[in-house]
């Protein structure tokens, strides 16, 4: 089973409540505003601030697919 991209319509960043982008290659949900990447483990997004990975400015401006 793969991550259901339909969930993107209802998921939001737990920090700023903003839009998340799906990075299929990295299996992460990206919040460009907070520069945080949330992992997807076993097709389940881990939307916990303390589990998020900080990303640099260059990564946060890239469009993920």
From Swiss-Prot:
Cystines in this chain: none
Any one cellular-component term (Gene Ontology): cytosol
Transmembrane stretches, start-end: none
InterPro entries per UniProt: Trm112-like (IPR005651)
Family stated for the protein in its record: Belongs to the UPF0434 family.
Protein name per its UniProtKB record: UPF0434 protein CPS_2127
Organism in which the protein naturally occurs: Colwellia psychrerythraea (strain 34H / ATCC BAA-681)
